Amino acid sequence: MEKLTILLVGSGGREHALAWKIAQSPLCGRLVAAPGNPGIEAVAELRAVKATDADGLVALAQEIGADLVVVGPESALEVGLADKLAAVGIPCFGGSQRAAQLETSKAFTKDFCQRHGLPTAAYGVFEDAASAGAFLDTLEAPFVIKADGLAAGKGVVIAPDRAAADAAVVDMLGGRFGSAGARVVIEEFMHGEEASLFAVCDGKTAVLFGAAQDHKRAYDGDEGPNTGGMGTYSPPPVLTDALIDQAWRELIVPTVEGMAAEGNPYVGVLYAGLMLTPTGPKLVEYNARFGDPECQTLMLRLDSDIVPILLAAAKGELANAEPPKWREEAAICVVLAAEGYPDAPKTGGRIQGADADFGDDVVVFHAGTTREFEGRLVASGGRVLNVCALGATLSEAREAAYGALETISLEGGFYRTDIGWRALQQR
């Protein structure tokens, strides 16, 4: 096979992990990332085109003669990048605007689940506080309140009592998340443990692509506000083969078939956020891309070339593709965040030690970083670095990641010291 020119869209830790893995492929001749970050720059050419500039990205893909475009963030799918690439005949690993509604509209997904009988929490969708209140009357605390649209992982409130639930509804409908909160989805609270399951899809076929468990709260002990994710590990012991099989049969397969039947064939990553309830896995939410930071641990564990499977998915040829192979080891990712994250992260803090050689089993991915004058590395976002490690056991991987973190400094930065606690406790 001839070497490919690949365009990677995005600039976070997830995209650095994808770039790192794509660059290892013998099929990758040229890798261009837009807009990228200083970590990605080590393995790819960077172009200053934003992930939400669909027309600019199509022009860039045409200019470089891209054989494949790999989309990292959901924001690029929401503006129809995959549709615009399809119109000019460029294969894209990422969903159409309509298919991406599985992530970009929680109401769309809940209604889809209802139409196809998929296991999920009872719910209602509301545009005014009065009707939302009437539905809350029928539920018991705690209450789950979600903004309908994209809110960077922060649009979900678990309200312990009715007063907090009413306040969350008023807050969202009042414009806290802009148009994303113009509708709210209210759900019954599901009891159980959460885990994430990943599938790569080509519109008609789905291939299992690993599992992970993440930590959404900002601080140790699962305290503090929700974030985009403070750390993750893979594989999660709680997600047994039997549970994966059940989720595959009851959620993934009917979703891919249902989307195709409704004229919205799903291409790209289908990321199922699962609640492992006493009666089996139920859907919390779908995401239309690799999780961040879940992707980072999957890339460390992936023991086969990623490019053929991405290309096969983009071209509708997954049925003939080699399934991915996985390393036996456990992987962990710990997020180093800027002071004030998630509410008001302070940017500009100086980063030191991130470029050290930590050995083969530790990889540091850049998330929110930029280079100032004289090449100095500083924080440019809320989640700054992802320190990832492999180990024969989760304990070993954890030791390696935290050992590396001790030698990395970020002014005012913080990280959780308990990533992986659930799995270690279960042992």
UniProtKB/Swiss-Prot annotation:
The keyword Transmembrane does not apply. ATP binds at residues 136-196. SUPFAM superfamilies: Glutathione synthetase ATP-binding domain-like, PreATP-grasp domain, Rudiment single hybrid motif. Its cofactor is Mg(2+); Mn(2+). Pathway: Purine metabolism; IMP biosynthesis via de novo pathway; N(1)-(5-phospho-D-ribosyl)glycinamide from 5-phospho-alpha-D-ribose 1-diphosphate: step 2/2. It comes from the Bacteria. Gene3D superfamilies: 3.40.50.20, ATP-grasp fold, A domain, ATP-grasp fold, B domain, Phosphoribosylglycinamide synthetase, C-terminal domain. Pfam families: GARS_A, GARS_C, GARS_N. Binds 1 Mg(2+) or Mn(2+) ion per subunit. Its EC number is 6.3.4.13. Belongs to the GARS family. NCBIfam families: purD. This is Phosphoribosylamine--glycine ligase. It comes from Caulobacter vibrioides (strain ATCC 19089 / CIP 103742 / CB 15) (Caulobacter crescentus). The gene is purD.
